[in-house]
Amino acid sequence: MLKKLLGIIFVSTLLTNIVVALEADIFVQTTVDRASKLLSDNISKEKKIEELKLIAKDTVDIEGIGFYTLGSNRKNLNDDQKKEYAKKFEEYFLKSFSSRLAEYTNPEIDVFGKEVLNENYTIVNSTLKATNERPEIKIDWRIYTKNPDQPLIRDLIIEGLSLARTQKEEFASVLSSNNGEIEALFKTLEEFSNK
């Protein structure tokens, strides 16, 4: 009886993980298709940027990425500083994300695989198809799946390089060269956002 019960629990867990993984790759493909359609539309770059920001707000865990990139420095912030950082990081992230992506016209991304890491994370594998201007690029998406009804992008790993980790290192460098003063990072974020 105990073996049968354990078998049922194991199969249930396995099926739950398969459903989460399926949702994660469908989520990525849907997000990619949405962005690709927008980028191929005959609208101004400014309009594309605004629409890309909306897509990012719907699909990316901006706050989670923001506090990850702050690293252990977040422990030193009071509540007001955390709120200010979250606001400034969101502005920074949205501008960086949308202005870079707006340069692409009709990017073709194929989602081809996935790996459930645990109940909270799934890695979705894809490639950005090659064109005459660029080679094929491997992109892995780290999807936060704790809430399967609303998966969120937590990181992109492009050709093995984590964008979130790279951002974390850049922010650590700014803080390190300014004696850990969060105001220096705030200023850096503001300057980028106001360009």
Which positions does each model-derived feature cover?
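Solvent-exposed loop/turn segments at secondary-structure junctions
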Residues: 74, 91-92, 130-131, 159-163
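Short beta-strand edge/turn micro-motifs at domain boundaries
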Residues: 136-138, 142-165
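Low-complexity, intrinsically disordered terminal/linker segments enriched in charged
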Residues: 155-195
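Sec-dependent signal peptide recognition
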Residues: 2-11
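Sec/Tat signal peptide C-region and signal peptidase I cleavage site
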Residues: 15-21
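Surface-exposed, charged secondary-structure patches
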Residues: 95-137, 188, 192-195
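Early exported N-terminus immediately downstream of N-terminal targeting peptides
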Residues: 23-101
